[in-house]
Amino acid sequence: MEWFFDTFLFCGQLRELRQRTATLARIQLGDAVLDVGCGTGTLAMDVARRVGRAGRVAGIDPGTEQIARARKKAAWRHAPIEFQIGVIEQLPFPDQTFDVVLSTLMMHHLPASLKRQGLAEIDRVLKPGGRLVIADFTRKQERTGQAARFHAGGSSMQDLAALVSDAGFDHLETEEMRPPRFSAFPGAGFVCAYKS
């Protein structure tokens, strides 16, 4: 199912988005990385290869089915990834646990109040100088019907960057990933920042 989703749904754009997310995060061997809204764990699998055996990868998602699939994928690949059910506004980890926190295509599901709570939690679990990379859909103004309801909490990259800045993060950068012409992919953007 993930293969179909990655390969055909958006003409491989999701794979490119995940790769760019990991690259922007400057993940290194031995890093501890948290994937917030990990879904079925595809990004976490790539991150596990990047951090090596000396690193740590954890993923949380509120979906029980997604976490079950992620655990199966990790077991099949013998990847030591900790997947658990959880929500961004109440991360089940001690303070200053992670070098990097990633979130891909998840923030658009949340209202602004939960985004703020979630960013405060990310700040709490990141080590000083830790890196945050958020990738999410852009161009919410063009969505209509069911897509508009699905992306009800969507925001522009500038709005998301402002929330990240308000949460106390430094050295903010944004980047846009334009969809190919005639693609169903709505376009995405990245917000990268560091914990003070």
Where in the sequence are the language-model features?
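C-terminal alpha-helical "lid/dimerization" subdomain adjacent to the S-adenosyl-L-methionine
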Residues: 11, 15, 131-188, 192
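Glycine-rich helix-loop-beta junction characteristic of Rossmann-like nucleotide cofactor-binding loops
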Residues: 23-28, 50, 91
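Class I SAM-dependent methyltransferase SAM/SAH-binding core
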Residues: 34-36, 40-90
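Short glycine-dipeptide loop
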Residues: 53-54, 126-131
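A short SAM/SAH-binding and catalytic strip from SAM-dependent methyltransferases
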Residues: 100-113
